[in-house]
Amino acid sequence: MIQMQTYLTIADNTGGKLAQCIKVLGGSKRRYAKIGDIITIVVKQAIPNSSVKKGDVCKAVIIRTSKEVRRKNGTYVRFDDNACVILDANLSPRGKRVFGPVARELRDANFMKVVSLASEVI
């Protein structure tokens, strides 16, 4: 579960390392976001000479959460960190690589490009 002020790691090769959630998209009263939801982030740490700079505001999709997610078959899946992938205006990933595993729930959220870039789908 991600809410405003939550820090996330950026799991792509755009150059951003750490991000902070500043808005959960999907309604004015919406408080929490889960895997596959789109949020607005601000980049807090970035490597030099990268496509995103510190202070950039952009949209991102959540690919991993430390809070467990219940699946239809009764199993739970959780990860070690909260992570996101930066999106462009067309809601496709801005980077060309995705680091670490991603959850299978991204397929249901129609983020097939992110799933295809990931090395492992759990």
From Swiss-Prot:
Record GO biological process: translation
This protein's name: Large ribosomal subunit protein uL14
InterPro entries per record: Ribosomal_uL14 (IPR000218), Ribosomal_uL14_bac-type (IPR005745), Ribosomal_uL14_CS (IPR019972), Ribosomal_uL14_sf (IPR036853)
Highest taxon above the source species: Bacteria
Function recorded in the entry: Binds to 23S rRNA. Forms part of two intersubunit bridges in the 70S ribosome.
SUPFAM superfamilies: Ribosomal protein L14
Keywords: Ribonucleoprotein, Ribosomal protein, RNA-binding, rRNA-binding
One Pfam family matching this protein: Ribosomal_L14
Family as reported in the entry's similarity comment: Belongs to the universal ribosomal protein uL14 family.
Gene: rplN
GO cellular component terms, A-Z: cytosolic large ribosomal subunit
Matching CDD domains: Ribosomal_uL14
Subunit architecture: Part of the 50S ribosomal subunit. Forms a cluster with proteins L3 and L19. In the 70S ribosome, L14 and L19 interact and together make contacts with the 16S rRNA in bridges B5 and B8.
HAMAP family named among the record's database cross-references: Ribosomal_uL14
PROSITE patterns registered for this protein in UniProt: RIBOSOMAL_L14
PANTHER family per record: 50S/60S RIBOSOMAL PROTEIN L14/L23, LARGE RIBOSOMAL SUBUNIT PROTEIN UL14M
GO molecular function, one term: large ribosomal subunit rRNA binding
